[in-house]
Regions:
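UBC/E2-like fold recognition across ubiquitin and ubiquitin-like conjugation systems
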Residues: 1-52, 58-131
Length: 131
């Protein structure tokens, strides 16, 4: 099973490399390919500019037919976004934790991470607890 998943990830490597241009970085666990960590740098000209957000990614055995789980790893106990909780929950339709378009097997981890980064483009300071 892990060999099949490894082949799928190999197809995604180019896209994962492209994420670096968007200040999104993914690092797979050397001992378990089903686990990874991601870092998203806050977008320029937003409240999150220069912020570093850490995420834990766990891929199911039936990936890509089901989405990975994504957990936010906060630096403190302050909620930074209406869709990103201090307890680690990320509300995103692709993850099945929010309304909207659902995950499909043609999607990959890039789809999720780009969607999370796009959440950070919201410039409405009233929605978040950062000054």
């Amino acid at each position: 099973m892990k060999q099949a998943i490894s082949r799928i990830f190999n197809k995604d490597i180019k896209q994962i490399e492209e994420l670096k241009k968007l200040d999104i970085h993914v690092n797979f666990n050397e001992d378990d390919i089903l686990k990874a960590n991601a870092v998203i740098i806050g977008p320029d000209d937003t409240l999150y500019e220069g912020s570093i957000l850490y995420f834990k990614i766990v891929f199911p055995n039936n990936y890509p037919f089901h989405p990975p789980s994504i957990t936010y790893l906060p630096n403190n106990k302050i909620r930074i976004h209406p869709n990103i909780y201090v307890n680690g929950r990320v509300c995103l339709s692709l993850l099945g934790t929010w309304s909207g378009p659902k995950w499909t097997s043609i999607m990959d981890i890039s789809s999720i991470l780009i969607s999370i980064k796009s959440l950070l483009n919201n410039k409405n300071r009233k929605l978040i607890n950062i000054k």
